[in-house]
């Protein structure tokens, strides 16, 4: 009876499993309470171990092993903190796994070893599921790109849709030198445009066409970090990343500003070398134009001294200003301000002389009326010619012959001379003269 009561009490307090063990131990004359207590302790240890295994299993898979990582770091060793990409601000697993990319599909598709300080960039999975790029991927910056030229299309015309018929988009080359960053960022912007991300690229005013999404920001950060190693970044880029390691948009905006500045510098140099001035425009406007160009070049690191500036200005002077080339050629220390004083003096003299001249311009109607009422009082000279020639007129040859004969025979009187001259003279077809024999 006592053993049956103990077995029932054991069954209620310790469960069916322990009750069966207790009933078995009754036949060996051992205390069933001691046995049940030991078995209960073993059950509790087993359950605690099982629970610990269940809780530790997801933790081990929280940071999956990266098949693309060349040399993964142990979890106990903290990654290095130097460089513009800090570990304490690393993106979460969800942020590092963007979806919906048509070309790369995901940053893990890029076949490059990630940074040692960022082991969470690439998700797990077999590498065969990601499309591979041609052998041209990862070529140096000097290798020509299949896209012709570095001309950028308008960001406003870029399609923000993530679907495309292209099989792949060639990624930008690896940056290998800080001096190559201006050329590299052009190819990187071209890569973003080909990836249907032209709308997030800053425009001329520094603002993008549309707002960037979280997945696009992650893709932008990952690709920039992979293809632009931190040791090859210029100092100004490192300064931006030291403040905000994800501010890639600011880097792109500053890069575009520098591109425009380089273009402006070239235009300013060409304009300064081809100056032309002849007084047709105000001297103040000409001086403002030239000084603004010189100040811009000096601020951008292209120093233009007074000697070079004066030579360029004087070479473009023409008209009355041309003599300034010779009056000042001996003054080696002449400044731009002194040269413009002479230009202003000539311009003011020109304006004063033009204002002092009276204006006698008459109306066109008055001139027409005067021309109609004007009469010519002087009689024109009229030369009257006799249309009928007499047959007894002599030619010059006959007259000369008569004069010669009259000189040879002075005894002949005037009547005989006049009589001989009144007789007709006959000419043959050869224009020879035939006189009468008596006249010889």
From Swiss-Prot:
The modification Phosphoserine is found at residue 416. InterPro entries: TYA. It is found in: Cytoplasm. Keywords: Cytoplasm, Phosphoprotein, RNA-binding, Transposable element. Pfam families: TYA. The record marks 401-402 as: Cleavage. Residues 1-93, 126-173, 352-440 are annotated as: Disordered. GO terms for cellular component: cytoplasm. Residues 48-60, 127-152, 419-428 have a biased composition (Polar residues). GO terms for biological process: viral translational frameshifting. Residues 429-440 have a biased composition (Basic and acidic residues). Induction: Ty1-JR1 is a weakly expressed element. Induced under amino acid starvation conditions by GCN4. Disulfide bonds: none annotated. Capsid protein (CA) is the structural component of the virus-like particle (VLP), forming the shell that encapsulates the retrotransposons dimeric RNA genome. The particles are assembled from trimer-clustered units and there are holes in the capsid shells that allow for the diffusion of macromolecules. CA also has nucleocapsid-like chaperone activity, promoting primer tRNA(i)-Met annealing to the multipartite primer-binding site (PBS), dimerization of Ty1 RNA and initiation of reverse transcription. The C-terminal RNA-binding region of CA is sufficient for all its nucleocapsid-like chaperone activities. This is Transposon Ty1-JR1 Gag polyprotein. It comes from Saccharomyces cerevisiae (strain ATCC 204508 / S288c). The lineage of its organism: Eukaryota, Fungi, Dikarya, Ascomycota, Saccharomycotina. The gene is TY1A-JR1.
